Amino acid sequence: MPIEVFFREEEDIPELEFIALSLCDGKVLDVGAGAGVHALYLQEKGFEVDAMEISATACKIMEKRGVKNVIHADFFQFAEKKYDTLLFLMNGIGIAETVDGFRNLLKHSKSLLTDKGQLIFDSSDISYLYEEYRIARPDHYFGEINFQYEYKGNLGQPFKWLYIDQQTLIKIAHEENWVVQILFEDDNDQFLVRMEPRGDMSIEM
């Protein structure tokens, strides 16, 4: 992934992410905020937004770029505040690592949301990659991926990441008692999701 992606200007933000940002409401937690692209945008629009990162380096970069409220924490260990919107962009829910981890992410998200709170994120169906590149499907869920970044010849630590297809997402969300809206799909099998814990039926399926 080009480093420039993490330092985009407003005019470089893709349509899917603009739609997601336009749906933010109330107090926002930007999870996996990176270098603060989305947090800065929301901040400039007058939102109260906390930018969370597990990377201390990323937190320092955000502070230097002018993000006001930076939280250095592991999302799954964080329980200090409640929010109206939990935002996971650039496939931020990938931090779940596995399908079972996604269930845990949904459970923990409920504990961080206000009564009318919402979860907004994007993901991708990567099943086409196995056919296009003739890769044998793994024994585990095909969207559970191992990653390793490289920058100028330096390799980072390997890490696990999750891409989840719509059918699997909806099945798990319903089992975990969430209401789901698929709001947008692009030509690259990437899609935008808005979810609320079931009980508030203001979202129609």
Language-model-detected regions and their locations in the chain:
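Conserved SAM/SAH-binding beta-strand->alpha-helix loop
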Residues: 55-56
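A short SAM/SAH-binding and catalytic strip from SAM-dependent methyltransferases
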Residues: 83-103
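Conserved SAM-binding strand-loop segment of SAM-dependent methyltransferases
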Residues: 66-77
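S-adenosyl-L-methionine
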Residues: 1-23
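A short glycine-rich, Lys/Arg-flanked "PGG" loop and its adjoining helix->strand segment in the class I
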Residues: 103-115
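Core SAM-dependent methyltransferase catalytic element
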Residues: 176-205
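Conserved class I S-adenosyl-L-methionine
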Residues: 23-34
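SAM-dependent methyltransferase
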Residues: 114-174
